[in-house]
Amino acid sequence: MLEMNNGRRIDLLLITSTQAKAIRRKQADKKLTAKQASDEIGITQVTYRKLRDGGEVKPIIYQKAMQWLAEDY
């Protein structure tokens, strides 16, 4: 999917159900609230909901989420 930003095209990336499950599992393993998890990732709670539930996000959000998942492993 595409999103326009100041006339520029941005390709959105899909958080798959498997990735969303991994995000939820890490949140649970660390005993974090959604607010705490979103703060650790560096995103808003609304954006975190998209990650947790699976959905399309901007590349920078995807990158932050994948970096967060890879931490501690």
Protein language model annotation of sequence segments:
Residues 1:
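General nucleic-acid-binding
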Residues 4-29:
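A short, Lys/Arg-rich alpha-helix, primarily the initiator
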Residues 17-21, 42, 59:
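Amphipathic alpha-helical repeat elements characteristic of tetratricopeptide repeat
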Residues 29-32, 57:
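Alpha-helical structural elements of signaling/regulatory helical domains
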Residues 54-67:
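Short, basic-rich loop-to-helix N-cap that marks the start of a DNA-contacting helix
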